[in-house]
Amino acid sequence: MPAPDSTTAILDAAEALFARQGFAATTIKAIGREAGVNPALLYYYFPDKERLYHAVLERRLGNASREIGERLTGSLPPLETLAQVLRGYARLMHGAPNLPRLLAREFADHQAEHALPMIREISAGLFQKICDVIRAGQSGGSIRGDLDPRFTAVSLVSQMAWFFVAQPAVSRMLGYEGVVPAARVERYVDHAVRFSLAALTSAPAPSAKATRKRVRS
């Protein structure tokens, strides 16, 4: 029976190639070569390339869901819980550099078709828990009551996700060639957490309608 390390090597190689060149351009033969195993061995674990791709997505998204979910089960106040979630999400994305590219390709090339079951599961569990934390903060008075918890949850995660997904552009905006240095990533994460918590607790901005009314008067 093949060693468990073979599975890890295959998944690592497949993840790197799918992220770098996409699902369609990646062959079983190339994955075997990258993993340093006979391509025939891949079929011992996975019946076809699509099942292997699903396994790659499941490994990363499943790990993300579990790790972030752990931060939502503690007894910290809502704002501290959300800060922990954001930091955990950033740590995951930074620690798995293929994940942002893999997700970007999945959304752009396949409209999230392969990841849809996992996204539904995350939406039903993790996303709803984040919304519940926001609602708890609103009920307790620590988070503004005028915010839609669903939009707020999307905004919190998106600003952290975009930093990693758009890394090639972000690095150049910040004056770097290649990846953003780890120390600078940490500074951005600190900024994003402070920025988010300030938005959740500060007074709401005047609406466009109210602004027009003041101008006319």
Q: Model-found features: residue ranges?
A:
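Hydrophobic alpha-helical connector segments
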Residues: 69-101, 149-156, 186-189, 205
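All-alpha amphipathic helical-bundle segments outside canonical DNA-binding/catalytic cores
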Residues: 80, 117-122, 139-155, 187, ...
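Short hydrophobic clusters on alpha-helical segments that form packing/core surfaces
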Residues: 10-18, 89, 196
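Amphipathic, non-transmembrane alpha-helical scaffold segments
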Residues: 11, 53, 57, 61, ...
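Helix-turn-helix
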Residues: 9, 17-51, 55
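C-terminal peripheral helix-coil segments that are non-catalytic and often amphipathic
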Residues: 88-91, 95, 124-140, 158-217
